[in-house]
Amino acid sequence: MNCDTAQPWMMSSYHPSTTSDVFWTTTPSSTSTTPSSDNGIQQYSSISTSSGYAPANSPAKTAEVNQLGGVFVNGRPLPFEMRCKIVELSRQGTRPCDISRQLKISHGCVSKILTRFSENGTIMPGTIGGSRPRVTTPKVVEYIRSLKRSDPGIFAWEIRDRLISADICDRANLPSVSSISRILRNKNGGNSSSSSSSQLRYIRDQLAEQQQQQHLQQHQYMEYNNNELNQISGNLDYQVSSSNTPPSYDSYHFIAN
C-alpha cells in the first residue's frame, strides 16, 4: 500500500481546537476515545481551578485514581475545601467510613485529618517534605526521668498527660509513647560521652586493682623467700670471719707481670 495515498480517515472533518482554553466536561462523549482515567484527571483539573476552565499552558500534574474512584495527586495535601467538608460531615455525626465513601477519599486520609483537628484544632496540612523537629529536648528528658524515679510504675501515656499538665510540652511538640519508652529504656539518655567516660573509668579501676594484687603477691613471695633463707642460714650456723673475706684492693692497685 502506498503511504502517500490519502486514506479515508485522513479526509474526516475533524480539526483540533485552536483556542487557548480548554473546557473539561464531566460527562464523557460517545465519540470520545479518551480512557475513563483521563476523564477523572480532567475532572480533577476543573475542580482545582476557581472557574470551569483549565489553561492550556498549565504544567501537567501526575494524578492517580484510588480504589474508591477518587482522584488525588501523590505527595500533595488534600485541598482545603475537601478538608472543611470532612470536618463538617464529622460534626453532623457521619462516620469516617461513610465520609470516605461519600467523598471518595481514603479512610486513612479522613482519619488523619479528623485526628489532627481533634488534637490541635486545625485542618491545615503539615510541612511538605523535611523532617519533624526534635521534641525530646534535655528538659523534657530530665522531667520524664524524674517522673519515672518518683513513680516507677507510671505508664508512658500518663507521662504524656503530666507533660501537658505541667506546661512542659503542648500538643504540637508532645513526644509520642514510643519516644518516651525509648527514653526510659536508655538510662544514659543517649549521652554517648558520659557512657564512654564511665566505661573508661571502670577499665582504669580494674587495671589499678590488678596491679595492686600483683604487688601484694610479689611482696608476700619476697617475705616467704626471706624467711626461708633465714631458716637455712640459721641451720647451717655459718659465720662470716675476716679470714673468709677476700682481700680488698684499692681502685688504683694492679698486679704487674
Swiss-Prot record:
Biased-composition ranges, Polar residues, are: 38-52
InterPro entries registered for this protein in UniProt: Homeodomain-like_sf, PAIRED_DNA-bd_dom, Paired_dom, PAX_fam, WH-like_DNA-bd_sf
Print the keywords alphabetically: Developmental protein, DNA-binding, Nucleus, Paired box, Transcription, Transcription regulation
What stretch or stretches form a coiled coil here? none
Organism source for this protein?
A: Caenorhabditis elegans
Q: Per its database record, what is this protein's job?
A: Transcription factor. May play a role in pharyngeal cell differentiation. May have a protective role in response to infection by the Gram-negative bacterium Vibrio cholerae.
Name one cellular component (GO) term: nucleus
The places in or outside the cell where this protein is found are:
Nucleus
Q: What is the lineage of its organism?
A: Eukaryota, Metazoa, Ecdysozoa, Nematoda, Chromadorea
- The gene from which this protein is expressed is pax-1
Please give the DNA-binding region boundaries: 61-187
Q: What's an example of a GO molecular-function annotation for this chain?
A: RNA polymerase II cis-regulatory region sequence-specific DNA binding
SMART domains under this entry?
Answer: PAX (SM00351)
Region PAI subdomain, residue ranges: 64-120
Question: Quick one: where's region RED subdomain?
Answer: 139-187
- What is the first-listed, main subcellular location in coarse terms? nucleus
**Protein name, per record:** Paired box protein 1 homolog
The processes (GO biological process) annotated in the record are: defense response to Gram-negative bacterium; regulation of transcription by RNA polymerase II
Q: What SUPFAM superfamilies does the record tag this protein with?
A: Homeodomain-like (SSF46689)
